[in-house]
A protein has these predicted regions:
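Short glycine-rich, Thr/Ser-proximal phosphate-binding strand/loop in the N-terminal lobe
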Residues: 17, 21-62
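Active-site phosphate/pyrophosphate- and oxyanion-stabilizing loops and adjacent acidic/basic residues
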Residues: 132
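Acidic, Ala/Val/Gly-enriched low-complexity intrinsically disordered segments
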Residues: 9-12
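ATP-dependent carbohydrate kinase catalytic cores
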Residues: 136-176
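Short beta-strand-loop/turn "lid" adjacent to the catalytic site in phosphate-handling enzymes
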Residues: 75-123, 149-164
Length: 176
């Protein structure tokens, strides 16, 4: 199953002629957040989370509301109105294998991340979830790119030499 990959920048509403993007990269002990205006980095923040706080959550998905509030508090402290952000981009994890590149996050991508279809319970999947929830809340677009489950094998590369047995790719392209 492939997700929608192509989109036009014209589809993404801009505020004051600026294309503002909030990038969300959840990790095991922190959430990295960057704000861009066009191609210029406005700021990058690493929001650390105490282990004692994270251990209170029985499942990675349960951290989503907590991390959402931490991000909103940081944006408020930086004087950034989330409504002025044109697009939310989240690190991808937990979804179907897919080609590298930019992918529009929709309800299907969100649901797949929640389910952890790739077998992952890493906080990376919260990136898609947070981007989608922010996009819904503020009426914007959500994207992800270069999933932790990239598959760009051609049909020939899938052959194993054993009838009915095929290779599949599960490559974290950002770790190459």
């Amino acid at each position: 199953m492939w997700y929608t990959i192509r989109f036009s920048v014209k589809e993404v509403e801009m505020k004051d002629g600026r294309f503002r993007i909030l990038v969300i990269n959840p990790g095991s002990t922190s959430t990295k957040v960057s704000l861009f205006e066009d191609e210029t980095s406005v700021f990058e923040r690493k929001l650390f989370h105490e282990a004692s706080v994270l251990l209170k959550f029985s499942h990675v998905n349960d951290q989503m509301p907590f991390r959402r509030e931490v991000i909103l508090d940081m944006l408020k402290a930086e004087g950034v109105d989330p409504d002025t952000i044109a697009a939310f981009v989240g690190r991808c994890g937990g979804t179907h294998s897919q080609p590298s590149g930019v992918i529009r996050v929709d309800q299907n991508v969100y649901d797949d991340a929640v389910k952890g279809l790739d077998g992952s319970e890493h906080p990376a999947k919260l990136g898609v979830m947070l981007a989608w929830k922010f996009a819904e809340e503020f009426g914007k677009s959500a994207f992800t790119l270069n999933s932790t489950t990239v598959d760009e094998l051609n049909d020939y590369a899938r052959l194993t030499g054993i009838k009915g047995v095929y290779r599949f790719a599960h490559t974290h392209c950002l770790n190459q």
